[in-house]
Curated annotation (Swiss-Prot):
Interacts with get3. GO terms for molecular function: protein-membrane adaptor activity. It comes from the Eukaryota. It is found in: Endoplasmic reticulum membrane. The lineage of its organism: Eukaryota, Fungi, Dikarya, Ascomycota, Pezizomycotina. Its main location: endoplasmic reticulum. This is Protein get1. Keywords: Coiled coil, Endoplasmic reticulum, Membrane, Transmembrane, Transmembrane helix, Transport. Signal peptide: none annotated. Residues 25-110, 173-199 are cytoplasmic.
């Protein structure tokens, strides 16, 4: 079992990563992974892809066929195109409804596993000290702030520790990002070659 110190830290790392990568990016990736599973939704998505290809192919054929010179052929292709387009729109509407439902489920699960867990930990362990401070090292008012709101005096509360973790993670990420940006911006300085003398 992870200690409370590390649990809070890893929850804040997860929250930071989700906020940095982007919730919509993660939702899109999870949707693609969900479509790879053998479900009715994945079959619907495969059918949608097939119909989309067929609509594009029929549209090309229709554009390549002259409506004046070969009207019968063009009209036949047009009817097939319209029928396929209608099927495609129907499946697309169904798939969009399923994606919306999936997105809501993922958002709820993501919130419960990150921010919901953070709030629960802060409520459940509000009177529990995360760790104790050495006695007489800090003045009374500093101990009071560090134990705010309900932890015993002379200890660090989970709320304070949670804020420290969030701040430390974001500052560390900024430092690492700045270091990578600085390394990436360094370009090789060309060394002047000696002039070749012509003989």
């Amino acid at each position: 079992m992870l200690s409370l110190i590390w649990t809070v830290f890893f929850v804040h790392v997860a929250i930071y990563l989700i906020n940095t990568i982007g919730a919509s990016t993660i939702d899109g990736l999870l949707w693609l992974l969900y479509l790879k599973l053998p479900t009715s939704t994945s079959k619907c998505a495969q059918e949608q892809t097939r119909l989309k290809r067929e609509v594009v192919q029929l549209k090309r054929e229709m554009n390549n066929t002259s409506s004046q010179d070969e009207f019968a052929k063009w009209a036949k292709i047009r009817r097939r195109h319209d029928k396929t387009m209608e099927e495609y729109e129907k499946i697309n509407k169904t798939l969009n409804a399923q994606k919306t439902s999936f997105d809501w489920s993922v958002k709820i699960a993501r919130w419960l596993s990150t921010n919901g867990l953070k709030i629960f930990l802060q409520f459940w362990y509000s009177k529990t000290p995360v760790f104790a401070l050495p006695q007489a090292w800090f003045p009374y008012y500093v101990e009071w702030v560090l134990s705010f709101p309900r932890a015993p005096m002379g200890s660090v509360s989970i709320q304070v520790w949670s804020n420290v973790c969030a701040t430390a993670i974001s500052v560390l990420a900024e430092i690492v990002t700045a270091a990578f940006m600085q390394m990436a911006s360094r370009t090789a300085v060309p060394v002047a070659a000696e002039d070749k003398k012509e003989l």
